[in-house]
Amino acid sequence: MKKLTSMVLTIGLGSALLLAGCGSTDSKVSDGVNKMLETTDELSKAIDSGDQAKVKEVGPTLEDQWSSFEDDVKKDNKDLYEKIEKYLDPTIAGSEAASLDKEALGTLNEQLTDALKELDKKTE
């Protein structure tokens, strides 16, 4: 009887740890996506107002935010990972450009935002 109880407790504890680990990855991705969506919103406002200094300040922060959880996305959602990467790099480059191309950067930022929203829905 003791062996059976020990085995049930061990399995239960192992399952709980496994589930906790899965939840933390989803939570990490969800938190990261939410931060990036806040940043793309802030970037959009800066683009619309033509505030190049703010664009140059905000745009590059996307890379640091993305790098904190991109490996988890790459592992679990390869298609969305590639879609985000497709728009992320040009958005960052456009935000660092010498002159602000509002139309091009605005479009890239919208496409990045849409890809992030898609990932957000998938991780709910």
Residues of each region from the PLM?
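C-terminal motif of bacterial Sec signal peptides marking the signal peptidase cleavage site
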Residues: 18-21
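Bacterial N-terminal signal peptides that target proteins for export
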Residues: 1-11
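Mature extracytoplasmic or organellar-lumen-exposed domains after removal of signal/transit peptides
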Residues: 23-124
